[in-house]
Amino acid sequence: MRILITNDDGINAPGLDVLHTIATDIAGPGGEVWTVAPAFEQSGVGHCISYTHPTMISEFGPRRFAAEGSPADCVLAGLHDVLKDTPPDLILSGVNKGNNSAENTLYSGTIGAAIEAAIQGLPSIALSQYYGPGNISLDNPFEAASAHGADVIRKILAAPGAFESHPYKLFYNVNFPPVAAADVKGIRAVGQGFREGGTGMGMRADMAPNGRKFLWITGSPQNVPSGADTDATVNIDGYISVTPMRADLTAYDQLQSLKDAIE
């Protein structure tokens, strides 16, 4: 199997090393793992692409490239430049430092890479490691992802219709709980949640000595449940969450009532 990996934390992020080890296990003997990751951190850029300027790319070593762009740019670079003659069988994004559960999904460059891979017609899985009191002080906070990542991916790949034919192909969002590997309770297939109290994203203003105003993004505590049988809730409870997703944003539950109202 040929696997392309990327992330949003950058080419030198520890989570990318974790993902490379996982991908090497999945690829198997004779398989290939290729890396095209951002040259600089791209957290929070979502599914953006750099269409207003070129993306510079450099080779960092065998099958290892850094692109000066977003995670979605890296997927495009991997598919249409680095591996243009030998496309990958699977694209993996992560392992993100921090969760991409609930509303975080919508901001995530890790998820953005998986979205672009799916739009390009390839199977893709995003992986993120929740941070919390149960793992932040471990020697390896990515311990849960390291120990369970390959098993989760194999289970997804083996699921019936995992990447069925559809104009908007499925991709998967995997979040590992903020606990030691031995304390992981299992795997749960759940929906995307919304944290109690809503998103904590906001802005804080600072004034520079020259009178210019600077606005800084602010966040909120992450160990907050996201509703019953949803990602952040089961993560906090010690379970790995797996959420099937599509980039189709249509609110189908409202489509017929809108048709009735305006047509």
UniProtKB/Swiss-Prot annotation:
Keyword annotations from UniProtKB, A to Z: Cytoplasm, Hydrolase, Metal-binding, Nucleotide-binding
EC number(s) given by UniProt: 3.1.3.5
Pfam families assigned: SurE
GO cellular component, one term: cytoplasm
Positions with a binding annotation for a divalent metal cation: D8, D9, S43, N96
Reactions listed under catalytic activity: a ribonucleoside 5'-phosphate + H2O = a ribonucleoside + phosphate
Gene Ontology terms for molecular function: 3'-nucleotidase activity; 5'-nucleotidase activity; exopolyphosphatase activity; metal ion binding; nucleotide binding
Main location (coarse class): cytoplasm
Gene3D superfamilies: Survival protein SurE-like phosphatase/nucleotidase
InterPro entries, per database record: SurE, SurE-like_Pase/nucleotidase, SurE-like_sf
Disulfide pairings: none
First-level EC class: hydrolase
CC cofactor: a divalent metal cation
Localisation per UniProt entry: Cytoplasm
Family recorded in the similarity comment: Belongs to the SurE nucleotidase family.
Reported function: Nucleotidase that shows phosphatase activity on nucleoside 5'-monophosphates.
Full protein name: 5'-nucleotidase SurE
Lineage of the species this protein comes from: Bacteria, Pseudomonadati, Pseudomonadota, Alphaproteobacteria, Rhodobacterales
